[in-house]
Design a protein with these regions (language model features):
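Internal, well-folded beta-alpha domain core
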Residues: 69, 79-216
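Beta-strand elements of well-folded, non-transmembrane domains
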Residues: 7-11, 58, 113-121
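Residue-level signal for secondary-structure boundary sites
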Residues: 13-15, 62, 121-123
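N-terminal, Lys/Arg- and Ser/Thr-rich interaction peptides
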Residues: 1-21
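Structural beta-strand/beta-sheet cores of well-ordered domains, especially the beta-sheet scaffolds
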Residues: 1-3, 45-47, 52, 107-113
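A short glycine/small-residue-enriched secondary-structure motif
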Residues: 9-11, 55-56, 70-73
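Glycine/small-residue-rich interface belts in oligomeric ring/scaffold proteins
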Residues: 19, 24-69
Length: 216
């Protein structure tokens, strides 16, 4: 059973992993970010969201901004030291460690996410597809979520609601846009985190993920 969710917001940043210093966003929301929004609305160990299609409702627009970030991170060695009972500084001084970085972000983003969910082996005997479908429907109608959905960064919150129409008019009808390699998701299955990519093609304003080939 599929569901359609409308998401929109002022800014978004789906940062390309190959550009580590200056932040540069992908042209549209990534499948993993879309799944993260759905998880923020309804997450349960007995189900897993699968994004089928992403409809782009607003033209792709960019904005250059500068953001305050910290230039270091807490090391795993310091964490282990504190866990073993020894004293060590386990914090970052944001005032002393602050730096500004440029970022190319998206603005005025507006999508419709078409998705379904698969049941997992962690589902209990009382769990069923109809149960989860009804739970998602109620949460969309009431605007409920487990935590605030966001577009790539928590500074860019995503508003959401159920898509009430039978058709979707995109910003790019009768147009095909090659978006290049895009992050699909992260594979956590074999003890190490492996990024997965796919060749993103925006056809008639729709990013179709149903039969895309994934590269590791």
């Amino acid at each position: 059973m599929s569901i359609m969710v409308e998401v929109y917001g002022d800014y978004a940043a789906f940062n390309r992993p190959e550009l580590k210093v200056e932040r540069m966003t992908y042209d549209v929301i990534t499948p993993s970010a879309a799944r993260g929004i759905l998880d923020a609305i309804l997450w349960h160990p007995g189900m897993r969201w699968v994004v089928d299609k992403i409809y782009v409702l607003s033209p792709i627009q960019y904005a250059n901004i500068r953001r305050n970030e910290v230039k270091s991170k807490i090391s795993a060695r310091n964490v282990r030291t504190v866990m073993n009972g020894r004293k060590n500084d386990l914090y970052i001084d944001a005032q002393a460690d602050i730096q500004q970085r440029a970022a190319l972000v998206l603005k005025n983003v507006h999508y419709v996410l078409e998705a379904h969910f698969d049941m997992t082996d962690k589902a209990s005997p009382t769990d069923s597809p109809a149960k989860f479908q009804e739970m998602m429907k109620r949460r969309l109608e009431k605007g409920q979520c487990y935590h605030q959905p966001y577009f790539g960064c928590r500074e860019f919150p995503a508003k959401f609601r159920k898509w009430e129409f039978k058709t979707v008019n995109t910003a790019y009808p009768n147009t095909t846009k090659e978006l290049g390699l895009m992050l699909y998701d992260m594979d956590y299955g074999k003890g190490e985190i492996t990024p997965m990519y796919f060749n993103a093609v925006l056809k008639n304003g729709v990013l179709d993920l149903t039969n895309c080939e994934v590269y590791r």
